[in-house]
Regions:
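A short acidic, often aromatic-flanked loop/helix-cap motif at beta-alpha or helix-coil junctions
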Residues: 93-101, 148-154
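Short loop/turn motifs at secondary-structure junctions
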Residues: 84-85, 118-120
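Short, basic/hydrophobic alpha-helical segments
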Residues: 47-57, 105-117
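Short, aromatic/basic amphipathic alpha-helical patches
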Residues: 75-83, 111, 133-140
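Single-residue recognition of alpha-helix boundary sites
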Residues: 17-21, 115, 137-138
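A generic "structured core" feature
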Residues: 41-44, 96-100, 107, 113, ...
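Alpha-helical substrate-recognition element adjacent to the catalytic core
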Residues: 1-98
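Acidic, Mg2+-coordinating phosphoryl-transfer loop and its flanking beta/alpha structural elements
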Residues: 119-154
Length: 154
């Protein structure tokens, strides 16, 4: 199985510093101004435990697909929360200002024809319905947040 996790609003609570745009996405320009201290104040959401369990499971490949432009502080946060061990981290380049849906489609689509990916079951966790819908069209199972409890560890 390949389990793909968004970060903000999915495994991380960054609501203390999020400014939302008209489409429900993060205001990217404002987001990039956050300090290390602000980033390290993000906290984990319940799905983070399932993500850690997936990272520990040798039969599961874990990917992170985030709209964040990851800085050293972001990687330190992932380390602090025990979720940095993902097999692949897809993050936004500094000059990439695309809306979240086309950005994530572009990041993911190129990986789907890899021999190690093609025939595997794929699940995508994202808090945004428009992103889940787009990923479902690419062949992912995309549970809505109200069903994430089924994936939490006991």
């Amino acid at each position: 199985m390949i389990a793909v996790f968004d970060l903000d609003g999915t495994v991380l609570d960054s609501s203390h510093r999020a400014l939302i745009n008209e489409q429900g996405g993060i205001n990217i320009e404002e987001w990039r101004t956050h300090t290390r201290e602000q980033i390290l104040n993000d906290s984990e959401l319940p799905l983070a435990q399932y993500m850690r369990d997936c990272i520990k499971n040798p039969s599961v490949r874990v990917w992170i697909c985030t709209s964040r432009n990851l800085s050293r502080a972001d990687y330190d946060l992932l380390d602090n929360l025990g979720i940095r061990g993902a097999d692949l981290i897809l993050s936004r380049d500094r000059n990439d200002n695309r809306e979240d849906v086309p950005y994530k489609i572009a990041k993911i689509r190129g990986k789907l024809n890899l021999p190690s990916v093609r025939k595997r079951e794929r699940v995508f966790f994202d808090d945004r319905a428009d992103i889940r819908h787009a990923m479902a069209r690419l062949g992912f199972v995309c549970p809505a947040p109200q069903f994430w409890g089924l994936y939490h560890s006991a």
